[in-house]
Amino acid sequence: ALDKYNIPLELKYLAIVESALRPTAESRVGATGLWQFMFSTGKMFGLNVNSYVDDRSDPLKATDAACKYLQALHKRLGDWDLALAAYNSGPGNVSKAIRRSGGRINYWNIRQHLPRETAGYVPAFLATMYIFEYSKQHGFNSDGPRIPYIATDTIHIKKQIALEHVAHLTDIDLAEVAFLNPQYKLGIIPVVKNQTYTLRLPIDKVGVFVSNQDTIYAYAQQAFNKREKPLPE
Protein backbone atom coordinates (compact mmCIF):
# COMPACT_ATOMS: atom_id res chain seq x y z
CA ALA A 1 0.00 0.00 0.00
CA LEU A 2 2.85 2.42 0.74
CA ASP A 3 4.27 1.91 -2.75
CA LYS A 4 0.83 2.57 -4.24
CA TYR A 5 0.68 6.00 -2.61
CA ASN A 6 4.39 6.89 -3.06
CA ILE A 7 4.98 6.89 0.68
CA PRO A 8 8.46 6.07 2.05
CA LEU A 9 8.55 2.39 3.00
CA GLU A 10 10.08 3.27 6.35
CA LEU A 11 6.73 4.69 7.42
CA LYS A 12 5.49 1.11 7.88
CA TYR A 13 7.14 1.31 11.30
CA LEU A 14 4.63 3.97 12.32
CA ALA A 15 2.10 1.21 12.99
CA ILE A 16 4.46 -0.17 15.63
CA VAL A 17 4.61 3.20 17.38
CA GLU A 18 0.84 3.56 17.16
CA SER A 19 -0.38 0.14 18.23
CA ALA A 20 2.53 -2.31 18.65
CA LEU A 21 0.95 -4.02 15.59
CA ARG A 22 -2.20 -5.00 17.48
CA PRO A 23 -5.23 -4.66 15.15
CA THR A 24 -7.64 -4.49 18.09
CA ALA A 25 -5.66 -1.93 20.10
CA GLU A 26 -7.78 0.86 21.54
CA SER A 27 -6.53 4.00 23.25
CA ARG A 28 -8.14 5.70 26.26
CA VAL A 29 -9.67 8.28 23.89
CA GLY A 30 -11.11 5.72 21.48
CA ALA A 31 -8.47 5.57 18.73
CA THR A 32 -8.59 2.04 17.35
CA GLY A 33 -6.63 -0.41 15.22
CA LEU A 34 -3.11 -0.77 13.82
CA TRP A 35 -3.07 2.89 12.82
CA GLN A 36 -5.12 4.22 15.77
CA PHE A 37 -7.83 6.03 13.84
CA MET A 38 -10.37 8.10 15.71
CA PHE A 39 -13.94 7.47 14.54
CA SER A 40 -14.26 10.78 12.65
CA THR A 41 -10.88 10.56 10.89
CA GLY A 42 -11.48 6.95 9.96
CA LYS A 43 -14.84 7.84 8.46
CA MET A 44 -13.19 10.57 6.36
CA PHE A 45 -11.00 7.89 4.78
CA GLY A 46 -13.65 5.26 4.21
CA LEU A 47 -13.45 3.22 7.42
CA ASN A 48 -16.93 2.21 8.54
CA VAL A 49 -17.92 1.37 12.10
CA ASN A 50 -21.19 -0.26 13.13
CA SER A 51 -22.48 -2.68 15.76
CA TYR A 52 -20.80 -5.66 14.12
CA VAL A 53 -17.82 -4.33 12.19
CA ASP A 54 -15.00 -1.87 12.85
CA ASP A 55 -12.95 -1.30 9.70
CA ARG A 56 -10.31 0.45 11.79
CA SER A 57 -9.32 -3.02 13.03
CA ASP A 58 -9.12 -4.44 9.50
CA PRO A 59 -5.36 -4.41 8.77
CA LEU A 60 -5.75 -3.98 5.00
CA LYS A 61 -8.47 -1.33 5.01
CA ALA A 62 -6.86 0.60 7.86
CA THR A 63 -3.43 0.55 6.21
CA ASP A 64 -4.90 1.84 2.95
CA ALA A 65 -6.70 4.61 4.86
CA ALA A 66 -3.52 5.49 6.79
CA CYS A 67 -1.62 5.82 3.51
CA LYS A 68 -4.28 8.16 2.12
CA TYR A 69 -4.18 10.23 5.30
CA LEU A 70 -0.38 10.43 5.37
CA GLN A 71 -0.34 11.35 1.68
CA ALA A 72 -2.85 14.14 2.33
CA LEU A 73 -0.83 15.44 5.29
CA HIS A 74 2.38 15.44 3.25
CA LYS A 75 0.67 17.27 0.40
CA ARG A 76 -0.55 19.91 2.84
CA LEU A 77 2.67 20.33 4.84
CA GLY A 78 5.35 19.40 2.29
CA ASP A 79 7.54 17.44 4.71
CA TRP A 80 7.36 13.89 6.06
CA ASP A 81 8.45 14.81 9.59
CA LEU A 82 5.69 17.40 9.73
CA ALA A 83 3.24 14.88 8.27
CA LEU A 84 4.12 12.46 11.08
CA ALA A 85 3.63 15.18 13.68
CA ALA A 86 0.26 16.02 12.14
CA TYR A 87 -0.72 12.35 12.16
CA ASN A 88 -0.27 12.42 15.91
CA SER A 89 -1.74 15.78 16.87
CA GLY A 90 -3.66 16.94 13.81
CA PRO A 91 -2.57 19.37 11.07
CA GLY A 92 -4.04 22.32 12.97
CA ASN A 93 -1.56 21.94 15.83
CA VAL A 94 1.35 21.69 13.39
CA SER A 95 0.23 24.81 11.53
CA LYS A 96 -0.08 26.62 14.86
CA ALA A 97 3.46 25.54 15.83
CA ILE A 98 4.78 26.83 12.50
CA ARG A 99 3.19 30.23 13.14
CA ARG A 100 4.50 30.37 16.71
CA SER A 101 8.02 29.59 15.51
CA GLY A 102 7.96 32.52 13.13
CA GLY A 103 7.18 30.54 10.00
CA ARG A 104 9.84 27.87 10.32
CA ILE A 105 8.95 24.63 8.53
CA ASN A 106 11.50 22.18 9.91
CA TYR A 107 10.12 19.80 12.53
CA TRP A 108 13.11 20.22 14.83
CA ASN A 109 12.72 24.01 14.75
CA ILE A 110 9.01 23.95 15.63
CA ARG A 111 9.19 21.02 18.05
CA GLN A 112 9.13 23.19 21.19
CA HIS A 113 5.80 24.66 20.06
CA LEU A 114 4.10 21.29 19.58
CA PRO A 115 2.07 19.41 22.22
CA ARG A 116 4.33 17.42 24.56
CA GLU A 117 3.29 14.04 23.16
CA THR A 118 3.92 15.18 19.59
CA ALA A 119 7.32 16.61 20.52
CA GLY A 120 8.36 13.06 21.41
CA TYR A 121 6.46 11.35 18.60
CA VAL A 122 8.87 11.76 15.70
CA PRO A 123 11.91 10.82 17.86
CA ALA A 124 9.98 7.71 18.97
CA PHE A 125 9.29 6.84 15.34
CA LEU A 126 12.93 7.35 14.34
CA ALA A 127 14.12 5.19 17.24
CA THR A 128 11.67 2.43 16.29
CA MET A 129 12.72 2.60 12.65
CA TYR A 130 16.39 2.35 13.62
CA ILE A 131 15.81 -0.66 15.88
CA PHE A 132 13.98 -2.60 13.18
CA GLU A 133 16.23 -1.55 10.29
CA TYR A 134 19.39 -2.49 12.18
CA SER A 135 18.02 -5.26 14.40
CA LYS A 136 20.48 -7.90 13.20
CA GLN A 137 23.48 -5.68 13.86
CA HIS A 138 22.30 -5.30 17.45
CA GLY A 139 21.48 -8.95 18.01
CA PHE A 140 17.69 -8.70 17.82
CA ASN A 141 15.93 -11.62 16.15
CA SER A 142 12.40 -11.60 14.76
CA ASP A 143 10.08 -14.57 15.02
CA GLY A 144 8.28 -13.51 11.86
CA PRO A 145 4.52 -13.23 11.40
CA ARG A 146 2.23 -15.60 13.26
CA ILE A 147 0.49 -16.48 9.97
CA PRO A 148 2.07 -15.14 6.74
CA TYR A 149 -0.35 -12.98 4.75
CA ILE A 150 0.44 -14.91 1.56
CA ALA A 151 -0.68 -18.10 3.29
CA THR A 152 -4.25 -16.75 3.64
CA ASP A 153 -7.13 -15.86 1.33
CA THR A 154 -10.62 -14.41 1.62
CA ILE A 155 -14.13 -15.70 0.99
CA HIS A 156 -17.17 -13.50 0.36
CA ILE A 157 -19.77 -14.34 2.99
CA LYS A 158 -23.32 -14.93 1.73
CA LYS A 159 -25.16 -15.45 5.01
CA GLN A 160 -24.61 -14.30 8.58
CA ILE A 161 -22.17 -16.53 10.38
CA ALA A 162 -20.20 -16.54 13.62
CA LEU A 163 -16.46 -17.09 13.73
CA GLU A 164 -17.02 -19.87 16.26
CA HIS A 165 -19.13 -21.74 13.67
CA VAL A 166 -16.36 -21.37 11.09
CA ALA A 167 -13.76 -22.62 13.55
CA HIS A 168 -15.85 -25.60 14.60
CA LEU A 169 -16.79 -26.77 11.10
CA THR A 170 -13.44 -26.20 9.40
CA ASP A 171 -11.37 -27.57 12.28
CA ILE A 172 -9.44 -24.35 12.97
CA ASP A 173 -8.65 -22.94 16.38
CA LEU A 174 -11.09 -20.11 17.16
CA ALA A 175 -8.24 -17.86 18.30
CA GLU A 176 -6.65 -18.22 14.87
CA VAL A 177 -9.88 -17.36 13.05
CA ALA A 178 -10.37 -14.33 15.31
CA PHE A 179 -6.75 -13.27 14.75
CA LEU A 180 -7.28 -13.30 10.97
CA ASN A 181 -10.60 -11.40 11.21
CA PRO A 182 -10.14 -8.77 13.94
CA GLN A 183 -12.64 -6.33 12.43
CA TYR A 184 -15.66 -8.34 13.57
CA LYS A 185 -16.37 -6.88 17.00
CA LEU A 186 -18.82 -9.51 18.21
CA GLY A 187 -17.25 -12.44 16.40
CA ILE A 188 -20.11 -12.37 13.89
CA ILE A 189 -19.88 -11.64 10.16
CA PRO A 190 -23.14 -9.92 9.19
CA VAL A 191 -24.88 -9.77 5.85
CA VAL A 192 -26.02 -6.25 4.99
CA LYS A 193 -27.55 -5.00 1.75
CA ASN A 194 -25.02 -3.25 -0.52
CA GLN A 195 -22.14 -4.26 1.78
CA THR A 196 -19.57 -6.97 1.15
CA TYR A 197 -17.99 -8.76 4.08
CA THR A 198 -15.24 -11.32 3.80
CA LEU A 199 -13.80 -14.11 5.89
CA ARG A 200 -10.03 -14.59 5.89
CA LEU A 201 -8.74 -18.14 6.39
CA PRO A 202 -5.52 -20.09 5.87
CA ILE A 203 -5.39 -21.12 2.21
CA ASP A 204 -5.68 -24.82 3.03
CA LYS A 205 -8.97 -24.14 4.84
CA VAL A 206 -10.56 -21.98 2.14
CA GLY A 207 -11.34 -25.04 0.04
CA VAL A 208 -12.79 -26.80 3.08
CA PHE A 209 -15.15 -23.88 3.69
CA VAL A 210 -16.22 -23.53 0.05
CA SER A 211 -16.83 -27.27 -0.34
CA ASN A 212 -18.98 -27.35 2.79
CA GLN A 213 -20.50 -23.87 2.76
CA ASP A 214 -24.14 -25.01 2.52
CA THR A 215 -23.69 -27.20 5.60
CA ILE A 216 -21.79 -24.43 7.42
CA TYR A 217 -24.44 -21.78 6.69
CA ALA A 218 -27.24 -24.15 7.72
CA TYR A 219 -25.44 -24.96 10.97
CA ALA A 220 -24.92 -21.25 11.65
CA GLN A 221 -28.58 -20.45 11.01
CA GLN A 222 -29.69 -23.24 13.30
CA ALA A 223 -27.33 -22.01 16.02
CA PHE A 224 -28.59 -18.42 15.71
CA ASN A 225 -32.21 -19.62 15.90
CA LYS A 226 -31.46 -21.37 19.19
CA ARG A 227 -30.00 -18.26 20.80
CA GLU A 228 -32.08 -16.54 23.44
CA LYS A 229 -33.85 -13.49 22.05
CA PRO A 230 -33.20 -10.18 23.87
CA LEU A 231 -36.94 -9.40 24.09
CA PRO A 232 -39.89 -11.72 24.77
CA GLU A 233 -41.88 -12.77 21.71
Task: Locate predicted features.
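Long, contiguous hydrophobic alpha-helical segments, chiefly transmembrane helices and signal peptides
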Residues: 15-17, 21, 35, 177
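Export/targeting segments at the very N-terminus of extracytoplasmic proteins
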Residues: 1-20, 67-73
